[in-house]
Amino acid sequence: MRIEEDLKLGFKDVLFRPKRSTLKSRSQVSLTRQFTFKHTQTQWQGVPVIAANMDTVGSFAMARTLASFEMMTAVHKHYSLAQWQTFVSETDPALLGHVMVSTGTSEDDFTKTRQILAMSSALRFICVDVANGYSQHFVEFLRKIREACPNHVILAGNVVTGEMVEELILSGADIVKVGIGPGSVCTTRVKTGVGYPQLSAIIECADAAHGLGGQIVGDGGCTCPGDVAKAFGGGADFVMLGGMLAAHEECGGEIVDVDGEPFMKFYGMSSSSAMDKHAGGVAEYRASEGKTVLLPYRGPVENTVRDILGGVRSTCTYVGASQLKELTKRTTFIRVREQENNVYGKE
């Protein structure tokens, strides 16, 4: 047993230190990034925010809307092949360039993913997603799918430490998904005692990935546009959002009437709700590691997207970054004990 004495930080522990800027308006800030991926040398250009591969967030409808903002969607793995075929046949190939095909690590997942990718050459992204990216089985699956799909960009996770980021990149991942336990409907830290404060995880994992020519996704922990900006400021190349995009028209979640007001069900993918729906219940050898909540129905997601992107643009103007790429170079975080004045409630 050993104890690491270094203090690790989450988004609530810091604020940006403002800096002099020559920018006159938020409209001068570009949030578009261009990446060349390590294993394929293919390029992608867009706004590096990704809708999470949760079945109440990462839907086909969400993908269509976010693509209009040049954002990405990791479409959840529970759509059938027939549903994928319909989506692909009805969708502009340019839009498919903003879609990730999500998969688990079973043999059935592997076979299904290859069948989906064969539907269109425009499907270039694979999201290999497990809760625990530290298992040898996961690394072996990553090598297998890299060998089978040499021309596809692979996102793999989740991990929270630099050495495992390096392992995944060297095993075939172009992008590594970072985050264990920070999500709004994740209870892993409570059920297992395992986790890592998200901002420190991003800072440390970004350093490891960039040294090998890879990228990272900060996955989880963002509750407001300022948190998204902090993730980018900490070095994340992409930021993945679940709860911030939940309960919208495009989500496909179950709508529940509560005292005449519409609410939408939102749950973690390791929750009993998810396992009841997709796995026939919680297996006797495991515990649920997610919660189920009802969120007020929020209408079309485009208004929320504009709020998030507007907040990040504003961050850039405060620190003098004319492009999102410059934000991490212009970032100085200050440690704080308070974030906002809540005398009249939270934003």
From Swiss-Prot:
Similarity comment: family membership: Belongs to the IMPDH/GMPR family. GuaC type 1 subfamily.
Family annotation (HAMAP family): GMP_reduct_type1
Catalytic activity: IMP + NH4(+) + NADP(+) = GMP + NADPH + 2 H(+)
The keyword Oxidoreductase belongs to this UniProt entry's keyword annotation: yes
GO biological process: purine nucleotide metabolic process
Function: Catalyzes the irreversible NADPH-dependent deamination of GMP to IMP. It functions in the conversion of nucleobase, nucleoside and nucleotide derivatives of G to A nucleotides, and in maintaining the intracellular balance of A and G nucleotides.
Keywords attached to this entry: Metal-binding, NADP, Oxidoreductase, Potassium
GO molecular function: GMP reductase activity; metal ion binding
Keyword Cytoplasm: no
GO cellular component: cytosol; GMP reductase complex
InterPro entries linked: Aldolase_TIM, GMP_reductase, GMPR, IMP_DH/GMP_Rdtase_CS, IMP_DH_GMPRt
Quaternary structure annotation from Swiss-Prot or TrEMBL: Homotetramer.
EC number(s) stated in the UniProt entry for this protein: 1.7.1.7
Organism: Aeromonas hydrophila subsp. hydrophila (strain ATCC 7966 / DSM 30187 / BCRC 13018 / CCUG 14551 / JCM 1027 / KCTC 2358 / NCIMB 9240 / NCTC 8049)
Annotated residues for binding of K(+): G181, G183
Name this polypeptide is given: GMP reductase
